[in-house]
Regions:
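Charged, amphipathic alpha-helical linker segments immediately N-terminal to NTP-binding catalytic cores
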Residues: 1-22
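Pre-Walker A adenine-sensing motif
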Residues: 25-35
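Phosphate-binding beta-loop-alpha motif at adenosine-nucleotide cofactor sites
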Residues: 43-46, 144-154, 176-180, 201-220
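Glycine-rich phosphate-binding P-loop
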Residues: 43-60
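Short beta-strand-centered segment that lines the nucleotide-binding/catalytic pocket of NTP-utilizing
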Residues: 66-78
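P-loop NTPase motor core
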Residues: 79-137
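A glycine- and Lys/Arg-enriched "phosphate-lid" helix/loop adjacent to the NTP-binding pocket
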Residues: 115-130, 139-190, 236-244
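NTP-dependent small-molecule kinase module
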Residues: 189-246
Length: 246
């Protein structure tokens, strides 16, 4: 599943400079379309540690109008969230019509890492995936545009980046699961592949992205969002009921 996303593809700076301007314009236009049609957009950014999940969130806020973007991080639960139903922390932060909700990790990140670390078994993992699949179907049925991104790195590249982060003491924000799963690359990737297989649907598809090069990663993310919005608008127009002449 991840072989083509671990090739280390990149865009030279000159080529990317021209491409970036075009993608910025299209992404900004897509955001305007969502505002016009009052479409909520839910973007989940998941992936291996060191793949640039935070950088992608920053890029989206820079390339689009940040006033309608809401970024949410789901690395650790608060005390209140632990007393609530599992989905409460997410329902409470879903985007309204015309807004873009960026979920770092989303409802997949924690479950994938707990399964990878052995904290939950396969039955519980599968049950969680089924709940998220149903939730996404419900959201998509109510016109939410769902974009799910898995940012990927090859094993050697990820190991080198993690080592560099440790060297520069950039590990302090990791939860225990983050650190443990980061050191178990094969287990994390296996769990992610299983999650993607179980939840990749037409109304809530996954896009697996080669995150080796920031330029290639950013361009791929922008294209995925633009394509999702265009598809949602096309479906809306297709389903529109024509007004009978008076």
């Amino acid at each position: 599943m991840f072989e083509s996303a671990a090739l280390g593809r990149s865009y030279p700076a000159k080529e990317y400079a021209a491409l970036e301007n075009d993608l910025r314009m299209k992404l900004f236009k897509a955001q305007g379309t969502c505002i016009e049609h009052k479409l909520p957009v839910l973007i989940t950014i998941a992936g291996v540690d060191g793949s640039g999940r935070g950088a992608v969130a920053n890029m989206l806020s820079e390339w689009m109008d940040a006033k309608t973007i809401r970024n949410h991080v789901f690395w650790m639960q608060t005390d209140e969230e632990r007393t609530r139903p599992e989905a409460w922390q997410f329902w409470n932060k879903l985007p309204a019509g015309g807004e873009i909700g960026v979920f770092l990790g989303g409802w997949y990140g924690g479950t994938i890492r707990r399964f990878c670390c052995g904290d939950i078994g396969e039955r519980e993992f599968n049950a969680s995936m089924e709940r998220w699949r149903r939730l996404e179907h419900t959201l998509a049925s109510s016109r939410t545009v769902i974009v799910k991104l898995w940012l990927h790195l090859g094993k050697k590249v990820q190991k080198a980046r993690l080592k560099d982060r440790l060297k520069h003491q950039e590990i302090h924000h990791f939860t225990p699961y983050d650190k443990k799963s980061a050191e178990n690359y094969d287990g994390l990737v296996s769990a992610a592949a299983k999650a993607i297989t179980l939840t990749d649907r037409v109304d809530a598809p996954w896009t697996v992205i080669d995150a080796y090069d920031g330029n290639f990663r950013n361009a791929s993310v922008a294209r995925a969002i633009i394509a999702a919005v265009e598809a949602a608008v096309a479906v809306k127009r297709q389903n529109a009921v024509p007004v009978a002449p008076t």
